[in-house]
Design a protein with these regions (language model features):
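Glycine-rich phosphate-binding loop of nucleotide-binding enzymes
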Residues: 1, 133-139, 162-169, 175-184, ...
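Beta-sandwich/jelly-roll carbohydrate-recognition scaffolds of carbohydrate-active enzymes
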Residues: 1-152, 185
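Short, conserved secondary-structure transition motifs
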Residues: 6-13, 201-211, 239-242
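A contiguous strand-loop segment
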Residues: 20-26, 32, 36-37, 47-51, ...
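Carboxylate/His-rich catalytic cores and anion/metal-binding grooves
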Residues: 106-132, 167-183, 204-238, 304
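Primarily short, surface-exposed interaction patches in extracytoplasmic proteins
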Residues: 118, 182-189, 193-198, 284
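Aromatic/His-enriched, Gly/Pro-containing loop or helix-boundary segments
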Residues: 145-152, 193-211
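Active-site core of glycosidic bond-cleaving carbohydrate-active enzymes
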Residues: 147-165, 170-171, 212, 222-425
Length: 425
């Protein structure tokens, strides 16, 4: 009609996904001109005219669905049926303030502005993409109905397992079970837990299986709004049945990912997997699965196989047990696109990636003093790097410590384990 435009778009950037949309105007329009489609586009473009008097305001509402046009229309009818902009604005303000009020901080206005802006960023994902009837389009492009009525996506788990999801358990615990339920629904569809889910689809971006620490963290904190045995089956299956970026037969055969067999991200993939293994072991022990506990505890120690004692660096190793030579510790790589042994980093940044066994890592260095001295070198080396390919994610360099990228986020705290907590402070 002359108040509404509906459509369907298939987007193939990053993941192939479908958007059904409804655009509704509070005033009628007239199609003034129909423009031909631009290069590669299927739909024509429209120029619309609205008969607005001076001072009039045009209001526009948009609803989306991954399922169908009817889903988008139902969302608009249920969630925003009227045209009271101020009412919607005040309700949005109320809901955001409800979240912001969960944390009280002191400091300057500038510090508070930065803090609450970060808190806002925290809460804009994951996104509940289910329609009002609970339907959603899953990772296999089929339509499902969520058991809970919600389906969370935008799960960038390599980025968020370290601090974001643990913070959700504190600041928005009412959503945690729903997030895990969504991960389990993804598992039922794909046979493994989400790695990087966007609009319900699996992007296979980044490495590791970091839905595992998210689920185990919630379980150990007492969250039980999901089937615990199914959750354990999902984390165990994701750690034993090979899938993209997870070649468990190779990993178990060598005790690491050899760079001549796994030519991209071999060091980072090994280290990230050992942390996931530790998490599986923790849940196995809690559930009394002693055989699994022993198996995954052993795998969690695989990081030791890549610590080169001559350099005290995590270094690539081939299937014959030979270290990568030559070895440039400053060579940055975004290995998924350019090759190399590290993911968005270099040896200096990934050597510390043993969050689950810092004491064991210290022993490999030869004690706390040598460990702390190496940390000092990290922070005081020249802040430069030799790049291969796209490395813009590695930002905020302080020496070789990359404050702006996830693999470094825990590193400043490691002084606490070396008896020099004042350096962390």
């Amino acid at each position: 009609d002359n108040h509404t435009i509906t459509g369907h778009q298939v987007v193939e950037n990053w993941v192939k996904r479908q958007y059904y949309y409804v655009i509704s105007f509070d005033k009628p329009y007239v199609v003034r001109e129909v423009l031909p489609s631009a290069g590669g586009e299927k739909a024509k473009r429209l120029i619309l005219d609205f008969d607005l008097a001076e001072g009039d305001t045009l209001q526009v509402k948009i609803a989306l669905s991954s399922v169908c046009l009817e889903g988008a229309k139902a969302a608009l009818a249920k969630e925003n049926p009227g045209w009271d902009f101020d009412k919607i604005r005040m309700e949005a303000r109320r809901q955001w303030n409800n979240l912001f009020d969960r944390v009280k901080v002191t400091g300057s206005d500038e510090q508070k502005k930065n803090f609450y802006t970060s808190l806002y960023h925290l809460f804009i994902q994951p996104n509940d993409m289910a329609d009002t009837d609970g339907r959603y389009r899953g990772a296999d492009d089929k339509v499902y109905t969520s058991k809970t009525g919600s389906y969370y996506s935008t799960l960038s788990l390599w980025d968020t397992y370290r601090a974001t999801h643990p913070l959700y358990t504190i600041l928005s615990p009412e959503r945690v079970d729903g997030m895990i339920q969504s991960m389990l629904e993804h598992y039922r569809t794909m046979g493994y837990l989400p790695i990087w889910a966007l609009w319900g689809k699996e992007a296979h971006c980044m490495i590791g299986n970091h839905a595992i620490p998210v689920i185990v963290d919630a379980y150990l904190k007492g969250f039980r709004g999901f089937d615990v045995e199914e959750a354990y089956a999902a984390i165990r299956g994701s750690s034993t049945v090979s899938h993209q970026h997870s070649d468990w037969e190779v990993y178990d055969r060598y005790g690491y990912y050899p760079f001549d067999i796994i030519p991209k991200e071999s060091v980072s993939r090994t280290l990230e997997s050992t942390y996931d293994d530790y998490c599986v072991a923790r849940m196995a022990k809690s559930l009394g699965k002693e055989k699994d506990y022993a198996y995954f505890s052993r795998r969690a120690s695989y990081y030791k196989n890549l610590l080169d004692p001559s350099t005290t660096m995590m270094r690539g190793k081939d299937s014959k047990g030979k270290w990568r030579t030559p070895f440039n510790t400053f060579l940055l790589s975004h290995a998924a696109t350019s090759g190399g042994d590290y993911t968005e980093g270099n040896a200096w940044q990934y050597t510390w990636h043993v969050q689950h066994d810092v004491e064991g890592l210290i022993d490999l260095f030869g004690g706390k003093e040598k460990f702390a001295n190496k940390l000092v070198s990290l922070f005081f080396l020249e802040s430069s790097a030799e790049n291969t390919g796209f490395t813009q994610d590695v930002t905020g360099l302080i020496g070789q410590y990359a404050h702006g990228n996830e693999p470094s986020h825990h590193v400043a705290y490691l002084y606490n384990y070396a008896g020099q907590s004042y350096k962390t402070q």
